[in-house]
């Protein structure tokens, strides 16, 4: 099977939501195949279905002053931050296309999240960074060592409707981690966040482009798809040709 891959650069969060909405409908109707969007967002806080507003530590006025948007969305999870230097991925997949891998004729929600985690663990490993899952906590974490506890390097929050996935993951690459001080990331107050840039040892020239290519390759492998790089959303649906243009 083919995984359509779109690298969109940096786009507004509202644009990303609208693009996902249209692609989910197109995937459900069979107009497009499985698709992965890779992109960055300007500074934004998103609150998932399980969010508590107390986990946003900054006032609306301060966020506006800093130019940080805030959106309530229908993904799972609590509050998270997106911003420059962070690779965001939105898989638009029909879980029924993985019928042989799951129960009841499709890949289950928990299995799907584990697969996303696995692709990100392999991506980090491409840069010499060993990561892991942590029981009871979705996402990807560095390994603890000595007195240093594990840190979160990638957050995951998904939505599944009629078997079609949306939302997805955020991998900190060269993210300014000070922006996470605006929130209690994912509602977890006893662990810190980190980035590939801080964790790599033998990759002095770490770039977003390298991480994008690694993530695309690893998602293709984990999900058993051949990756097909596309130039623009219009290559998927003609009506999307101008959606992400400034």
From Swiss-Prot:
Transmembrane parts of this sequence: none
Pfam family of the protein (one): LplA-B_cat
Enzyme type, top EC level: transferase
GO molecular function: lipoyl(octanoyl) transferase activity
Active site: 186 (acyl-thioester intermediate)
E.C. no: 2.3.1.181
Sections of the chain in a coiled coil: none
Domain of life where this protein originates: Bacteria
The BPL/LPL catalytic domain, residue ranges: 30-227
InterPro entries registered for this protein in UniProt: aa-tRNA-synth_II/BPL/LPL (IPR045864), BPL_LPL_catalytic (IPR004143), Octanoyltransferase (IPR000544), Octanoyltransferase_CS (IPR020605)
Catalysed reaction, written as an equation: octanoyl-[ACP] + L-lysyl-[protein] = N(6)-octanoyl-L-lysyl-[protein] + holo-[ACP] + H(+)
Binding locations of substrate: 75-82, 155-157, 168-170
Site residues (Lowers pKa of active site Cys), renumbered to this chain: 152
Subcellular location as annotated: Cytoplasm
Any one Gene Ontology BP term: protein modification process
Protein's pathway: Protein modification; protein lipoylation via endogenous pathway; protein N(6)-(lipoyl)lysine from octanoyl-[acyl-carrier-protein]: step 1/2
GO cellular component: cytoplasm
Sorted UniProt keywords: Acyltransferase, Cytoplasm, Transferase
Database matches in PANTHER family: LIPOYLTRANSFERASE 2, MITOCHONDRIAL-RELATED, OCTANOYLTRANSFERASE
Record family assignment: Belongs to the LipB family.
NCBIfam families: lipB (TIGR00214), PRK14345.1 (NF010925)
Note, other: In the reaction, the free carboxyl group of octanoic acid is attached via an amide linkage to the epsilon-amino group of a specific lysine residue of lipoyl domains of lipoate-dependent enzymes.
Function: Catalyzes the transfer of endogenously produced octanoic acid from octanoyl-acyl-carrier-protein onto the lipoyl domains of lipoate-dependent enzymes. Lipoyl-ACP can also act as a substrate although octanoyl-ACP is likely to be the physiological substrate.
Name of the protein this chain belongs to: Octanoyltransferase
Gene name of the encoded protein: lipB
